[in-house]
Amino acid sequence: MELDAIINQAQSQIDAAQDAATLDQVRVEFMGKKGKLTDLLKGLGKLSNEERPAAGQKINQAKQVIQQAISAKGEFLRTEELNKKLAEEAVDVTLPGRTEKPGNLHPVSRTIARIESFFGELGFSVKTGPEIEDGFHNFDALNIPANHPARADHDTFYFNPDMMLRTQTSGVQIRTMEAEKPPLRIISPGRVYRNDYDQTHTPMFHQVEGLMVDKNVSFTDLKGILHDFLHHFFEESLEIRFRPSYFPFTEPSAEVDVMGKNGQWLEVLGCGMVHPNVLKAVGIDPEEYTGFAFGMGVERLTMLRYGVNDLRAFFENDLRFLKQFN
């Protein structure tokens, strides 16, 4: 077959190729080990010395022509494939965007943030402390005697006789009073642990305690601040009562109730004036300084604010429940 005919045949097959695989078959047919041009090169040995150089040059020129045609068609096919892919993946910018559903704060986190915001505006700073506490900071310094029920094994998680998971964040107040001098205004949010589990109790829950120590601090100050806090937190006018109670670390002590929508009183927090023995335990003179303290269960406040009946729902990570608080 003459070279012109081979070139024409190759060009025809190259033009007809619709994909890279077919184009490669054309390359093999004409320039592979057993290709038509390769066979012609092998036949050069049969020619005379005078004919061989000119014939070899013509075969190589034909090979270059076919190779250039294959390269050009290959580039065309790659461009065509890319354009096709881009067209398939094209985004219609005139369509409205697909919005992602945003996450949201856990209801307990929301409550803690609301509490911190309110008391922060009154000059209270946020303090934290260890969740593994010793007996002095968890009990002794708080005027809780050795025979108090709170110190029993069935209420407290002990590591050894003097180390335990804290049962309240009051230890943070003790550590703050040891480290800083009055005047003091602090709140201490955090996790606390008690050996209890039912519809209204879990072994771990969140608590916020507050402390104010200064000269001439009175129960009237405590009552006014808590009254304003509850109205601010629930965002409605509430009937509030302070009911006499007993806590080892405060004297006098009170529990604060709000009137529920069902016409019944609901306990929301405990409070009182810091007991002189607590001030003495941290080296503060109770003759010079007085103070008040209060404590509230975060989950309980959250339940009341959002109408949740089972405290355990806060810890089950059910998205159907949590999405209600967006």
Swiss-Prot record:
Residues at which Mg(2+) binds: 251
Gene Ontology CC: cytoplasm
Pfam families linked to this entry: Phe_tRNA-synt_N, tRNA-synt_2d
Note accompanying the cofactor annotation: Binds 2 magnesium ions per tetramer.
EC number: 6.1.1.20
CC cofactor: Mg(2+)
Subcellular location: Cytoplasm
Catalytic reaction(s) noted: tRNA(Phe) + L-phenylalanine + ATP = L-phenylalanyl-tRNA(Phe) + AMP + diphosphate + H(+)
Family affiliation: Belongs to the class-II aminoacyl-tRNA synthetase family. Phe-tRNA synthetase alpha subunit type 1 subfamily.
Subunit structure: Tetramer of two alpha and two beta subunits.
Name the UniProt record assigns to this protein: Phenylalanine--tRNA ligase alpha subunit
The organism of origin for this protein: Alteromonas mediterranea (strain DSM 17117 / CIP 110805 / LMG 28347 / Deep ecotype)
Gene: pheS
